[in-house]
Design a protein with these regions (language model features):
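Polytopic transmembrane helical bundles with strong interfacial aromatic enrichment
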Residues: 1-206
Length: 206
């Protein structure tokens, strides 16, 4: 579903903003033509291995291998997140001087001013979201379980998910501050536009 949604979104963007998407692909040829497809395929393959290897590894008492597979899956997912944060922040804080953008290397465009702050923010945000998703799934399974043992297990799952979500969410405001501070240091007018101009109501709702 995610792949289909992403493909549809890309198709719409190519039609509606053809010049912009062409420029973005031309600015990050290695990332979009090699890096992103490779990471996406690897992550998908490891995800299927992770899901379908649980029963055989559990029966063979080799849960450690399943944990290692999960760690590899998370590393690939994190790499994909970090890689795509490059073009996202390039649109916000492109390297200066702006008239030399066409002569700047691809890595310099990725490692721009806001790249690492956004990485921090998204890492913490995704960790929080993951914890709460575990909590939601645990609550759903709890409500639909008939056996007492299952209800006790999913009650425990919900508590653990909630604990993870709250614990990881605590530093989220600090990560947001670091990200916005970097934008202000890059160009204060961008920060003013976000915080007190047309985007101010969006920030207030947040």
């Amino acid at each position: 579903f995610t792949a289909l949604t992403g493909g549809l979104f890309l198709f719409v963007m190519l039609i509606a903003y053809e010049d912009f998407i062409t420029y973005l692909f031309a600015s990050f040829p290695t990332l979009f033509m090699v890096g992103y497809p490779t990471l996406f395929i690897l992550e998908t393959a490891v995800m299927y291995i992770y899901v379908y290897s649980w029963d055989p590894l559990n029966k063979a008492n080799k849960k450690g291998r399943h944990i290692v597979t999960g760690v590899i899956l998370n590393i690939l997912g994190l790499s994909l997140l970090v890689a795509l944060d490059g073009p996202a922040t390039f649109m916000q804080t492109p390297p200066k001087p702006l008239n030399e953008l066409m002569n700047i290397g691809e890595w310099a465009k990725i490692a721009n001013s806001a790249w690492m702050p956004l990485n921090y923010h998204r890492l913490v945000g995704n960790g929080t979201f993951g914890g709460y998703m575990v909590c939601v799934i645990g609550a759903y399974m709890y409500l639909w379980s008939d056996k007492k043992e299952d209800r006790e297990y999913y009650d425990w799952v919900g508590y653990i998910g909630n604990l993870i979500g709250v614990a990881i969410m605590l530093p989220l405001p600090a990560m947001g501050y670091i990200f916005v501070r970097e934008i202000y240091q890059y160009d204060a007018t961008i920060g003013m536009y976000i915080m007190s101009d047309r985007e101010s109501m969006f920030m207030l709702v947040q």
